Design a protein with these regions (language model features):
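Flexible C-terminal active-site loop/helix
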Residues: 2-20, 25-38, 342, 358-438
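Metal- or metallocofactor-binding catalytic centers and their adjacent structured scaffolds
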Residues: 18, 56-132, 138
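Conserved, mostly hydrophobic/aromatic
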Residues: 30, 59, 81, 120, ...
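Short N-terminal binding/cap micro-motifs at the start of the first secondary-structure element
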Residues: 40-45
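Short beta-strand elements
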Residues: 46-54, 398-401
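Shared catalytic-loop signature of beta/alpha-barrel
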Residues: 79, 83, 95, 269, ...
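Proline-centered loop/turn at the N-terminus of a beta-strand
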Residues: 135, 149, 250, 301, ...
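Metal-dependent enolase-superfamily TIM-barrel catalytic cores that perform enediolate-based chemistry
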Residues: 147, 152-293, 297
């Protein structure tokens, strides 16, 4: 009895039901799922490989990822998702996505569960592209452009790493890591040498830079009440860049959701003089009414927010008019399948989409595929330090910014593979599920 006959003998549901409860099983079958937490490179990352075989014995491997609480996400994949996925049709992407999304949302599973779905979805889209010999953006209806405009966000090689790896690091992504002086440490340089950093980015072809200049104020003062001196401190790098370089580079501010409504207004009104392209997450998106009040009371564009992870959360923001643009992380909202839904919804409101990446190479590639197939995407975030120092240790493809753009991936699938040496079965962060074990 071959592998396909064994699966057919074990499961009689050859096709999906209208509820998607039974996975469609007539195409290339999922034979194994591997996950890895690369603690020594990016400890917050979960890398995934999905193995597939068709009836003629041909094999493929799909690649995906997500970021944050990776061990918990791996448990969701292996302990909950794998019984549905193993032996099922790898190309039944919508069936898998709809069933797993509805099961997770039914019990408020918008953390590790939605990240797990995102990682699986990326891998399945990668497989679809490989099997059909097309890049994902082509399967999504693209191209709508040949390359995607990018900006640099103020992370560094030490961003998001533990304080065991980098002494003094907070170990909490998005929590105001000050960085340290050194090559590519843009979180440090954006505060201490902002003009020099801006010049360097312009020379490298970047069109924009996002600063985290109020994070230090928050670490010292908290976010409930700031003085005029505090506001001036956070504004200083922006003023220095504008005074030295004028409008040669777009400037944005990420507030990481640290501030109260009153303080957020103070910051926004002070920022008007430096003409930012947008303000991002100056306050948390917890209350839609507060977000609307904030946007209506200022004259600076507002971006909201990779802190949102469900389609319904973005819908409420768009319906209420709480944002001038939305930011999406593809590996937090349900993968390619979730991201394209949200980006297309935003188009109905004439609100542009921004793609997030501080989180991993497959996240960045997924954003490029969405941008390559959706005219509403305006900008792709990058962290040049990650492109230069971390991503080369993870994937087999170089991602190079040229003239402020990244080219659309032309390779079939997502456009890269995990480095083969990452998935060592003896690695402490490795897990595998297949038909024999989980």
């Amino acid at each position: 009895m071959n592998t396909f006959e064994k699966w057919d003998d074990q499961r009689t549901d050859l096709a999906s039901s209208v509820t998607q409860q039974h996975a469609y099983r007539r195409g290339p079958r999922i034979t194994a799922i591997e996950t890895l937490v690369p603690h020594d490179i990016m400890p917050g990352l979960l890398a995934i490989r999905v193995h597939v075989q068709d009836a003629d014995g041909r094999v493929w491997m799909g690649h995906g990822e997500t970021y944050y609480v990776p061990t918990s996400v791996a448990s969701v994949i292996h302990d909950f998702f794998s019984p549905r996925l193993l032996g099922s049709d790898a190309l039944a992407i919508e069936s898998h996505w709809r069933f797993l999304y509805e099961r997770m949302i039914a019990f408020a599973g918008t953390g590790a569960e939605l990240r797990a779905l995102s990682a699986i979805d990326l891998a399945l889209w990668d497989l679809a592209g490989q099997i059909h010999q097309e890049p994902i953006w082509r399967l999504l209806g693209g191209p709508v452009r040949d390359s995607v405009p990018v900006y640099n966000s103020s992370g560094g090689p030490s961003y998001g790493r533990s304080n065991k790896q980098v002494p003094g690091a907070s170990g909490w992504p998005g929590h105001g890591d000050p960085g340290k002086q050194g090559p590519l440490e843009d979180n440090w340089a954006s505060i201490n040498q902002p003009v020099e950093l801006a010049k360097e980015l312009i020379d490298l072809g970047y069109r924009g830079m996002k600063l985290w200049s109020f994070d230090g104020v928050y670490r010292r003062q908290g976010g409930q009440l700031l003085t005029a001196r505090d506001i001036d401190e956070g504004l200083a790098p922006f003023r220095q860049i504008r005074n030295a370089l004028g409008d040669q580079i777009d400037l944005m501010l990420d507030g990481h959701g640290f501030f109260s409504l009153g303080v957020a207004r103070q910051i926004a009104r002070a920022m008007q003089e430096v003409r930012p392209l947008w303000l991002e997450d100056i306050l948390r998106p917890d209350c839609i009414h507060t977000m609307v009040e904030f946007r209506k009371s200022i004259d600076v564009p507002v971006a909201v927010s990779e802190m949102l992870v469900t389609i319904d959360a973005y819908r409420r923001v768009l319906e209420a008019g709480a944002a001038d643009m939305i930011m999406i992380d593809p590996t937090w909202v349900g993968g390619i399948s979730g991201t394209r839904r949200i980006a297309e919804l935003a188009q109905a409101y004439n609100v542009p989409t921004l793609m997030h990446d501080c989180t991993g190479p497959m996240t960045l590639l997924a954003g490029l595929h969405i941008a390559g197939s959706n005219t509403g995407v305006a900008y792709q975030e990058t962290v040049r330090a990650h492109l230069a120092t971390l991503y080369p240790h993870l994937i087999d493809t170089e991602l190079r910014v040229e003239s402020g753009h990244l080219e659309l991936p032309m390779r079939p699938g997502i456009g890269a593979s995990w480095r083969a040496d990452l998935f060592d079965s003896k690695h402490p962060g490795y897990r595998r599920s297949d038909s024999g074990h989980r």
